[in-house]
Amino acid sequence: AEYLHPDDFISGFETFLAVSKNENLKGPAVILSGILPHPEILRLLDRQGVRVVDDDLLNCNRRMPMSRGLAQGPYEILVENYFAMPPCPTRGSPIQERIDFMMDKVHKNDVQGVIFCGIKFCEPEWFDVPQMVAAAKDAGLKTLLLDLEVNQPLSGQLATRVEAFVEMIS
């Protein structure tokens, strides 16, 4: 929705709602964390019956302020919104805040697994992954790490890894 004209987004969203209204919601639930993966990966998850019930993606939920402020001026609003954003490694958030934020999503959504998507050479996004994976595993969750390249299409190897992960959480 970020780059679409509102008319295009609204019609696409209405189509999505109409198509998915009567869908069976029994597939395994996952959270995506990191960088939004290529659409082919998302389509593969959809074909496998996976439900992405929440996200901790840099360009999705991590950009949404967690609380609405009371500031009036444009600069105050900008500052308030920046500091109201969810924890993010690109802003130097403490790792425990990120873990708590993710685990809160896990508990609210009855999640079976977490998929961590990172782009090669995007170090800030990878800084917290070892501790976040450990926290997810301690909670009994399965994890999948996808080390991707910008605009990397779905390869056979990547598809096999995703399919194996889906089998583990199903």
What is each stretch, according to the model?
Residues 1-67:
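A charged, amphipathic alpha-helical module
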Residues 47-97:
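Flexible internal linker/loop segments at domain or repeat junctions
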Residues 112-120:
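Acidic beta-strand-to-loop metal/phosphate-binding motif
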Residues 31-39, 120-127, 153:
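Gly/Ser/Thr-rich loops at beta-strand to alpha-helix junctions
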Residues 93-110, 127-128:
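A short, acidic, amphipathic alpha-helical segment used as a generic capping/interface helix at domain edges
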